């Protein structure tokens, strides 16, 4: 497994792979890898000749400096996991390598609408940072496919739109959420939970599933469903942050023409902001 930290070396390797006619898959990450990331890697390996994993804690997508400062950096352990998975290339650049003149004056990519609604409304600049770094990685790695987790549902929708709008010739693969046995969606932020909070955490998925059951049973008073769910989260020990029920294909409000709904839940548990989602077919 090759570990590359600079743009010239990365470009050199990508040129070689292109000359050899290899099909390249990219898995963009911020490191602190867990089994959910490994599922992305496995999906990439099944679809390509060469797998490139990027590890970069992107300062442009953090709306709170304290979150950026405390985000776990575990490059050595991450590389050991990826080596066992037989990943071909790890791109782990420094912030200086990606943003040589800082982030304030760096050219950015913005996806109107999707970047400022829902999660974007409560995290200003977050999705602009995501679309900027992902487009830069696409430009550098020139992958045939790129794999993203469905846990970050809005992020995946944003990247699909960016790819369509910008004409990137890249297949975007959404990989289903990987869960612990008790239902908790795997996330790097789970590491912020205390042992006691970890016991409470699966309650998020239980509330999510309860909303899904109500929708499947034909209930359509969304305001009431959301209000009850928020109350249930707070009673379980969470601080409910945001609960949305949207059209899964547009992320707009549910309408009579909506065929699928996506339930998007965000809640604080101690210092961890946990997110999860579930898609429901509407009868």
From Swiss-Prot:
Instruction: Give the keywords, sorted.
Output: ATP-binding, Cytoplasm, Ligase, Nucleotide-binding, Pantothenate biosynthesis
Where, by residue number, does ATP bind? 30-37, 149-152, 186-189
UniProt enzyme class: ligase
One GO biological-process annotation of the entry reads: pantothenate biosynthetic process
Q: Where does beta-alanine bind?
A: 61
Q: Name one Pfam family in it.
A: Pantoate_ligase
Q: Might you report a single GO cellular component term?
A: cytosol
Q: Which HAMAP family match?
A: PanC
Q: Which reaction does it catalyse?
A: (R)-pantoate + beta-alanine + ATP = (R)-pantothenate + AMP + diphosphate + H(+)
**What name does UniProt use for this protein?**
Pantothenate synthetase
| Purpose of the protein | Catalyzes the condensation of pantoate with beta-alanine in an ATP-dependent reaction via a pantoyl-adenylate intermediate.
* Self-association state and partner proteins as the record states: Homodimer.
MF terms from GO for this chain are:
ATP binding; pantoate-beta-alanine ligase activity
Tell me more from the record. The reaction proceeds by a bi uni uni bi ping pong mechanism.
Q: In which pathway does it act?
A: Cofactor biosynthesis; (R)-pantothenate biosynthesis; (R)-pantothenate from (R)-pantoate and beta-alanine: step 1/1
């Amino acid at each position: 497994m090759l570990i590359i930290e600079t743009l010239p070396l990365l470009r050199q390797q990508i040129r070689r792979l292109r000359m050899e006619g290899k099909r390249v898959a990219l898995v963009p990450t911020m490191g602190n890898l867990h089994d959910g990331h490994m599922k992305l890697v496995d999906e990439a390996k099944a679809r390509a000749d060469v797998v490139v994993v990027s590890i970069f804690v992107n300062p442009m997508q953090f709306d709170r400096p304290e979150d950026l400062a405390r985000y776990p950096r575990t490059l050595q352990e991450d590389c050991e996991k990826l080596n066992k998975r037989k990943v071909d290339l790890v791109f782990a650049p420094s912030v200086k390598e990606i943003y040589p003149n800082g982030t304030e004056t760096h050219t950015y990519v913005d996806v109107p609408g999707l970047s400022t609604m829902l999660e974007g409304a409560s995290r200003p600049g977050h999705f602009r940072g995501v679309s900027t770094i992902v487009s830069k990685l696409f430009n550098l790695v020139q992958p045939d496919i790129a794999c993203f987790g469905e846990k970050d549902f809005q992020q995946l929708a944003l990247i699909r739109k960016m790819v369509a709008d910008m004409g990137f010739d890249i297949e975007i693969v959404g990989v289903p959420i990987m869960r612990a046995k008790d239902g908790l969606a795997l996330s790097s932020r789970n590491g912020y939970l205390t042992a006691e909070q970890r016991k409470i955490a699966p309650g998020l998925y239980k509330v999510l599933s309860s909303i899904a059951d109500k929708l499947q049973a034909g209930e359509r008073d969304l305001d009431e469903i959301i209000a009850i769910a928020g109350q249930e989260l707070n009673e379980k020990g969470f601080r409910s942050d945001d609960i949305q029920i949207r059209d899964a294909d547009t992320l707009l409000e549910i309408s009579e023409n909506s065929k699928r709904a996506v339930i998007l839940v965000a809640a604080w548990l101690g210092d961890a902001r946990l997110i999860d989602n579930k898609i429901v077919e509407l009868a």
